[in-house]
């Protein structure tokens, strides 16, 4: 079976769009043997800390360090993201046939800490 991961998921922090809790989503991905999960809530990252914290509560041993200590990583890799709103002109509030609604959604995912900082 091919490897699959959900990379565009809304949680309870996407009002009117998502209902699943971060913990339940993460547990379901473990149950389904998915290697990663990205949460991409609408216009906010309120669940990011909870999401990464949840991931580090459920880890696996991937090796030993030079001192013989276990090296741990999350069972399912947490990918932090957000579905941002993109507009050409944020001051336009009404639209007509001539002035079309040019609002878009753009999903951005952070590959690592540097990506998150950007």
What are these regions, as identified by a protein language model?
Residues 1-118:
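Phosphodiester-processing cores and adjacent nucleic acid-binding clamps
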């Amino acid at each position: 079976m091919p490897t699959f991961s959900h990379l565009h998921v809304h949680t309870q922090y996407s009002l009117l769009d998502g209902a699943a809790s971060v913990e339940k989503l993460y547990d379901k991905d473990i149950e389904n043997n998915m290697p990663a999960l990205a949460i991409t809530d609408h216009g906010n990252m309120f669940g990011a800390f909870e999401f990464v914290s949840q991931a580090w509560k459920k880890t696996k041993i991937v090796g030993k360090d030079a001192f013989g200590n276990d090296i741990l990583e999350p069972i399912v890799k947490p990918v932090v993201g957000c579905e941002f709103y993109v507009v050409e002109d944020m001051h336009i509030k009404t639209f007509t046939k001539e002035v079309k609604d040019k609002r878009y959604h753009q999903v951005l995912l952070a590959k690592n800490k540097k990506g998150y900082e950007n």
